[in-house]
Every structure is written in structure tokens, then in C-alpha cells.
């Protein structure tokens, strides 16, 4: 039996699919897991999951070493026993990140990362290893990739990159397939050698993202979306993938232009939809 990566949305907000209602709760998800799945890893995302540190701690107690938290880093980071790592979304150098996420957001996230490393680097514990960065490359930040890598190399553990996945045609943030996108991927391959063991993406995955690979229109075809069970805060399965919605009438991502890291990683190592 293979393991699955599971994403639970524990935040109370997601702008495309938000509905009011009580959280499904950790115990409900735990029961579902034990009855239905053999889970290898749980990624807790949002929204902002650190609004619910209590839920994060419960998961870490239940599955120590198999929990990661995807956060925007605007809430101070706490060391949690059993947490594999924090995945902090930092979308470029200061100017680019602030343009995407709002004035002052870069300073807040950077401060919280550095404060965490300083606070918990005691008694031989290497707190920097707990921090991975997540960079979603788009039409705003793609020109500053090396500046970004240079700034964080030697401070945090790794950076994982992906490309913006559109929900609408002519999305202004989408970095289209073609010359500029190829140039960025060539640069990432070069930087992987210049800054060893820092960029988490392997060459095969990066090269995959040069063109359409997983779907047609808004339908996943070769994409192994089945390998990632994505649940929202009510415990409902999100379709077609972790950035979708349980609501079939909601706007769906354009699979044909997918740049998501987790699915392209699985595809690049041979896990594909063959049905």
C-alpha cells in the first residue's frame, strides 16, 4: 500500500470557496484517516493555519515527524515538537513580495523567520533546518530569482519553487509558456549548481514545467491528483486538486497551465494517472 499526502485546510478563509460553518475538526479527520487511508504526510494549509496552533499541535502529537505547515509567516512562528518543517510563502524580494501581498508584509515575514531561528537555536538545536521557503513564480517576481536565492542561502534550509496556476484566462500573474518561462527554468537549473542543496526541485521536475503536462482545460488527465487528498475546513474533498473546491459550481484552476509543485513532483518521479 502506498502512502498519500493529505492537505487539510484549517483556516477560516479561502477567497474562492469560503463557506461559513464549524470546522470538521481534528478528531473527525483523524477518524477518517484511520478508517480510509494510510497517510504518509499531512500538509496543513490555508488561509493561515497558524491561527489554529491548537490544531497544528494535535496533528503533530498524532503523527510526529510527518506534519508540515504552509504559512504566510505573518504570525510569529513557534517551535512545535513533532513538526517536520514550516513552509513559509515568500514571493520574491521585498519589492515583489510587497506588491503581491501588501505593503509591509515582507518585513513581517522576514522578521518572524529570523526571530524563530534566533530564539530556538539553543543547546545545539539547528532551528534554521525547520524553515523552508515556498516561492510561487509569476509575472511580477520572475526577474529577481537569483537575488531572492542569494538573500536566503545559508539562512534557511531550502526553497521550493512552483509557477502561478491561473483560474481565469489571461490571468495577469501567469508567466506563460515560452521564452521567458524557459529562461527562468534555465536560471533555476544554473542556480541549483551555484547554491548546492538549496533549491528543492530536481531538474526533471523543473524541465517538466516548461510546458503543459498534466491536464486539458480544467480537467486533470495525467496529473496524479488522486495521490493528494485535499480536505477543506469542513472535511469535504476539494476538486480537482488542493487549490480547488468541494463545490462543483466553483471556479476551477486551469489544469492545462498547472505550475503546482506537489503534483509536478509526483509526476516527475513516475506517479501518474494512467486511468
Per-range role (PLM):
Residues 1-79:
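Conserved alpha-helical substructure of the radical SAM core
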Residues 10, 35-38, 225-228, 271-275:
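N-terminal [4Fe-4S]-dependent radical SAM core
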Residues 55, 241-244:
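Residue-level structural signal for beta-strand termini and adjacent loop
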Residues 11, 47, 91, 164, ...:
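Flexible loop residues that form catalytic
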Residues 77, 238-240:
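A sequence-level detector of short linear motifs
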Residues 17, 24, 84-85, 89-238, ...:
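Radical SAM enzyme [4Fe-4S]-AdoMet core and its adjacent flexible, acidic
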Residues 244-275:
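Radical SAM enzyme core and accessory elements
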Residues 1-12, 225, 253-263:
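Local cysteine-cluster metal-coordination motifs and their immediate loop/turn environment
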Amino acid at each position: 500500500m502506498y502512502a498519500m499526502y493529505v492537505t487539510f485546510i484549517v483556516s477560516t478563509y479561502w477567497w474562492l470557496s469560503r463557506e461559513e460553518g464549524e470546522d470538521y475538526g481534528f478528531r473527525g479527520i483523524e477518524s477518517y484517516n484511520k478508517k480510509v487511508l494510510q497517510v504518509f504526510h499531512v500538509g496543513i494549509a490555508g488561509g493561515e493555519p497558524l491561527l489554529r496552533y491548537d490544531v497544528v499541535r494535535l496533528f503533530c502529537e498524532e503523527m510526529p515527524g510527518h506534519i508540515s505547515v504552509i504559512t504566510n509567516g505573518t504570525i510569529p512562528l513557534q517551535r512545535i515538537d513533532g513538526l517536520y518543517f514550516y513552509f513559509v510563502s515568500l514571493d520574491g524580494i521585498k519589492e515583489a513580495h510587497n506588491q503581491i501581498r501588501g505593503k509591509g508584509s515582507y518585513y513581517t515575514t522576514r522578521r518572524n523567520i529570523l526571530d524563530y531561528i534566533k530564539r530556538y537555536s539553543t543547546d545545539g538545536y539547528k532551528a534554521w533546518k525547520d524553515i523552508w521557503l515556498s516561492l510561487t513564480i509569476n509575472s511580477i517576481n520572475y526577474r529577481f530569482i537569483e537575488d531572492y536565492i542569494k538573500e536566503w542561502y545559508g539562512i534557511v534550509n531550502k526553497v521550493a519553487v512552483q509557477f502561478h496556476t491561473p483560474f481565469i484566462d489571461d490571468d495577469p500573474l501567469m508567466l506563460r509558456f515560452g521564452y521567458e518561462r524557459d529562461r527562468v527554468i534555465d536560471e533555476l537549473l544554473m542556480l541549483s549548481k551555484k547554491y548546492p542543496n538549496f533549491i528543492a526541485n530536481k531538474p526533471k521536475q523543473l524541465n517538466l514545467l516548461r510546458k503543459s503536462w498534466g491536464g486539458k482545460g480544467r480537467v486533470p488527465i495525467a496529473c496524479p491528483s488522486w495521490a493528494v487528498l485535499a480536505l477543506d475546513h469542513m472535511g469535504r474533498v476539494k476538486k480537482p486538486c488542493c487549490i480547488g473546491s468541494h463545490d462543483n459550481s466553483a471556479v476551477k484552476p486551469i489544469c492545462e497551465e498547472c505550475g503546482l509543485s506537489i503534483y509536478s513532483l509526483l509526476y516527475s518521479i513516475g506517479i501518474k494517472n494512467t486511468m
